[in-house]
Amino acid sequence: MNRLTCILFLLTILSLKATAKADWWLEAEDPASTATTNDGVTTIIAPKGATWWYKHKMSGNTIIEYEARIVADPRFKTDKGETRVSDLNCFWMADKCGGCGGKFANNYALKLYYMGYGGNWNTTTRFRRYKGYWPTEEKEWLRPVILREYTDKAHLIKADHWYSIRLEAIDGRVRYIIDGECLVDYVDPQPLTSGYFGFRTTLAHAEIRNFRYTCSDPDNDGVRLEWIGNKSHGPVTFGVPYAVGEADKQTIFSLTTNDGRQIDTDTWRLASWADGSAKWQAFSAVIPQGTDYCVLRKTDKKIGTKKGRQSIREENEEWGEIPPFYLTLNNKVMPVEKQETERQGKVSRLHKYSGRNCVMRAYTYKGSKEVKIVHTLIVDSSLNTEGLRELSIHFKVPMHGEAYKRYVAFDDRRSMSVQPLIARRKIDMQAMDSVTRSMLDNIAQWDGFRLSQLSPNGHSIRKRTYPDAPWIGTIEGQRSEGVVTVGDSVASTTFRMKDFWQSYPSSIQVDGARGDTAIVTLSLYSPEAEPYSFAHYDSIPHTLEAAYEDVQPGMSTAWGIARTSTIYVNPETTTDRQLLPTPEYLHRKRAFGIWSLPVLVSPRDSLVENAIQEIMSFYDREIERNGWYGFFNYGDVMHGYDASRDEWRYDVGGYAWDNTELASPAMFWYQFLRTADPVVWRMAEAMTRHCSEVDTYHEGPHAGLGSRHNVIHWGCGAKESRISEAWWNRFYYYLTADERVGDIMHEVANADTLLYILDPMRLAQPRNLYPCSAPARLRIGPDWMGYASNWLTEWERTGNIVCRDKLQAGMTSITSLPFGFTQGPLALGYDPATGVITTEMPEMEITNHLMPIMGGFELVNELQGAINNPAFFHMWLNYCRDYKEKAWLLRKSKFRIPRLQAYAAWHGYEKLRPAAWKSLLDNMPLAPKPSLWTNDCATWVLDAIFMQEVVNK
């Protein structure tokens, strides 16, 4: 028995050694190269280039550790006859296990991370990311860029020294650590998530030992979904991003609560990657009470119900019901012209109603009585002229039983009885004697009840006995939540108007409470308020020089704008609820490009993070302090502050409402992504609703464009894509799957065709002074950048190849311009039919600071993961590298955009890193200064969030 045990032990050892040797192969440029393993140490003799490849593919978050050294071997000499010590190199996450013949340059064809420690005869230590392109003489720029370089002696090879090396590829961040020192900390815009390891050297005697690695899937346990703000329950719809290839049409998903209860879900595709896999997937479900968080998993088969445990669908099969309703506008009934079921799932149904001035969607859910209604008012030419006097949705609610058992309750106030049992004589309801019956016949019955919020800081509650009777009552309050419950002894119905007081003037009125059917009128714009005029604030323009205003004849029109409101019937809760993936997951999947999670390691980190948070708190306070509320205002913020009056310039031309200028929506959204802060969510959501509707045209001559900042949201004559572009709305759409925002993004897909008739540079650079034979003109930024975001969004949402081709044509034609992104004049030739950009002044070079700071920079970051166009991104890198110098040289512009310098530093121009940080930290937007601008706050926050990710280490 002992002899048999010994034999088995020896066989196991031999098997392990054979397996270890079989795990590797040597790819060498010179056949004389050798690799031998003894006592756990592999010795590589490489007269020329050689790679010791590990055959097993690694996947997921990967950590590789080993020890290695270069031996001072007299067989290898320098040109001076000295012993050569060089090239302790490695590849990791390579897309192929070699196969390139051993020659170093041949590996350019692979996608991998490369560290050349002590390369070039032990004079440099360099890190590169290979992208799989073969460089040629014509395209030398395809050669992998040096992303990090050391030349000091401390970071070169010491002969015969065993180095402890650790390689990491975790959540898109790549690190190289040697003897405990991190030499590389690189965020890859296109992370390599699987691949092979290769130990590389040349003209050297190298040794490697104690090789080991671990791979893990951070999403192995599913996607954790958490509440934004307080824990809640009820119907939710949310979006989840996936990396390329992670989920396809055959993927089955399961949703469970934190305590293991299974929840039925509907799911549908929001956006796709170029290979057809899911980029964003939407989910709808009814979350049960007591749920702290949920977990979403991918499965290979349907999940059954555990024995003895009911699924949510078995507990409640009922669907919410939409009460009968009708719509009025300016006290006239607005007929529904079309009704359709837009989506039918096992958990949710979407009903769509369309009319002349409105689009309304109603969402119902199995397992919940809640109905969500999203109503959009569209201002047509008639309403623009007439003005807005009233806008309401009227619901019919059946009433039952005696009047004294009927009631109306507003917010969390005590119920108001239709017939309060208060009389001079005692009422004995149990005895129901003749005195009691007489009292009941003579006690007043109240037929109407009204809650009015005509300002953001005051509401009143009144009631009346019949339609023509006066309203009586003295109930007052400040800010109503816009909730009413109408009920009796049999049933009750509750209504809630989201953002009720913020969207004043609004009101809720109940009529017919004494009859068989009560009418509950939810007035989105209360008829009690003064009529709203869409006219411009003045009859004359005030010029760019005087008031930063660009008013033009006939352009200050509200024809085509919209306003969206949300209403709930029988809401599960009386507060908003949203379930979303964690910031860590969104960050890992690169949702919306490159951004950082909060970093608090160094004093500089604390300074930056505190400043970002203070800017968020500042706008939250300013919204409240200045009362930036109202039906057509809520969600926007002001553009510029007037220190002389100590107030915002609400009455000065282009300095008033902000209208997305310099990416103010993105400022809030990126901070929300990294923090899940419910206060920031509220500001970002409100701004998206406002800017996508009120600042944007949805019909009429300017449909697809938006209005530049002004005293009146639609007052400026500059109607441009930079305001209406899909980029601002992608955040809310992909996180919530909101169909109305989806409609808006679809509306702008072909907005560039308006360039045929509306030239954005018609005044600044008239055609007679800047020759152009193209059918239209635009600027690369912000015009083309805005259109590009529209095309990207339409392509990934619908698969529209026309939009894809326009996007690619624009990218290719920009790289063909003599000066690329700095090609002059500002107004370049453009063909909306093909997407091609041209110039007829090839010798002119010019810079434009608006190009990257109105969403263009963030768009390009996301394009890197969607479009394979290395020439375009190489030209963008050069633009970022040279912008500051060229802006001063060509235009004497000092406009700071430190994220451009940071981008260049991130991609290899390390010397620009200190300049980027100095520019950021020397210009704190809330520091004491003569003026304060939302422009400065937005650009600073976006600079900081990007820089904290890519140039922080």
Where does each model-flagged region fall?
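Short, solvent-exposed beta-strand-to-loop segments that form ligand-recognition rims
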Residues: 178-196
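Short tryptophan-centered beta-strand motifs in secreted/extracellular beta-sheet-rich domains
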Residues: 64-66, 161-169, 174-176
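Secretory/extracellular carbohydrate-interaction modules
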Residues: 48-138
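Terminal, non-catalytic domain-edge segments
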Residues: 576-583, 590, 595, 606, ...
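Catalytic cores of eukaryotic secretory-pathway lumenal/extracellular enzymes that build
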Residues: 328, 335, 343-354, 359-361, ...
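Beta-strand/loop-rich accessory regions of lumenal/periplasmic or secreted enzymes
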Residues: 94-99, 103-125, 278-279, 284, ...
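Short, aromatic/His-centered strand-loop micro-motif at the edge of beta-sheets
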Residues: 139-164
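Short carbohydrate-recognition loop motifs
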Residues: 34-50, 348
